[in-house]
């Protein structure tokens, strides 16, 4: 920690002689540092690995031994991103991470499995850009993420930039239970959005629900303007939808959009939706009114070669194995 570079984010830094590293990937699996396995102890205490501390002292961690990784990469911003809101997304970084773009501090994150997203519209520029990240292996977050698995560090999921229009979606929520008779579906949709254009021109917020043949079975829309940032649509009843269960995973497609009053699409996105009700009655777990047994596994997202980075191909193999053995529940660890 004490020997870490402190000017790593500056443009004057020559990183041409720094070693390369695969991202996503844990640095201990690529020759930098030592993987540590402990069950419930903290790896920075003598019960785990470190010779420096005899017992934990939350929220503090050792300053004399705190391995730190520093990353830099140059990239060119796409030419068609003018007048758009630009975001940096780090989908999973293990350690206390500090993010910089073009020498300016963007933000920090500590949660290893939660995406960290930052608006960098005022920092990103045309042409060459430099992203720099410094990750400290230990922080107060280690007290919350102490679990029975390999303790390794670094960038474990994708890091990327993306652009959205100045009027864009920020979030949406979908609820799709069955009615009390487990016959018809109930569709509830709430959409959140923002207008960074500086203008109060009206636009239309809406959604469409499509079946597996892309046939529309429900829709709703409303016009908004001004400083409005959320629409909660009136719930709809979907007559006798194909229900979702682990054995019959029927799904519909929900398309959420923002449009100009003339119908031009500003932004649209989609997600899969299944109609189901999960509840506990008389100490019995029910799905769509039917009792089920939980047959599950723990999933640590671990690979002997790449650490906590798991490829999409390997994930698919894991799912195929689970289904082969009738697994219907997965606990992510």
Predicted regions and their residues:
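Short glycine/proline/serine/threonine-rich loop/turn segments at secondary-structure transition edges
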Residues: 81-85, 124-128, 237-251
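Accessory beta-strand-rich segments of carbohydrate-active enzymes
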Residues: 1-4, 18, 26-29, 34, ...
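Short, solvent-exposed loop/linker segments at the N-terminal edge
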Residues: 176-185
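Extracellular recognition modules
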Residues: 132-134, 253-257
């Amino acid at each position: 920690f004490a020997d870490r570079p402190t000017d790593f984010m500056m443009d004057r830094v020559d990183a041409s002689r720094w070693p390369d590293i695969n991202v996503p990937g844990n640095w201990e699996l690529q020759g930098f540092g030592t993987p540590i396995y402990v069950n419930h102890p903290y790896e920075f205490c003598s019960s785990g690995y470190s010779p420096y501390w005899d017992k934990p002292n939350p929220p503090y961690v050792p300053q004399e031994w705190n391995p730190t990784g520093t990353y830099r990469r140059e990239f060119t911003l796409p030419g068609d991103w003018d007048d758009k809101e630009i975001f940096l997304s780090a989908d999973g970084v293990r350690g206390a991470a500090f993010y910089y773009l073009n020498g300016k501090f963007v933000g920090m994150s500590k949660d290893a499995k939660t995406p960290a997203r930052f608006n960098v519209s005022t920092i990103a520029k045309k042409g060459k850009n430099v992203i720099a990240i410094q990750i400290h292996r230990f922080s107060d977050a280690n007290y919350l993420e102490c679990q029975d698995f390999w303790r390794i560090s670094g960038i474990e999921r994708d890091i990327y930039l993306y652009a959205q229009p100045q009027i864009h979606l920020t979030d949406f929520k979908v609820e799709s239970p069955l009615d009390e008779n487990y016959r018809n579906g109930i569709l509830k949709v709430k959409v959140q959005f923002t207008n960074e254009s500086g203008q109060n021109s009206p636009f239309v917020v809406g959604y469409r629900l499509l079946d597996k043949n892309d046939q529309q079975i429900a829709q709703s829309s409303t016009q908004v303007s001004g400083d409005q940032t959320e629409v909660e649509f009136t719930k709809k009843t979907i007559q006798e939808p194909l229900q979702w269960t682990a054995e019959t995973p029927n799904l519909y497609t929900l398309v959420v959009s923002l449009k100009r009053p003339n119908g031009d699409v500003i932004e649209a996105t989609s997600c899969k939706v299944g109609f189901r009700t999960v509840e506990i009655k008389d100490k019995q777990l029910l799905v769509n009114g039917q009792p089920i047994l939980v047959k599950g596994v723990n999933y640590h997202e671990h690979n002997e070669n790449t650490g906590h980075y798991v490829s999409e191909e390997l994930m698919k193999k894991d799912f195929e194995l689970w289904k082969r053995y009738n697994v219907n529940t997965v606990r992510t660890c």
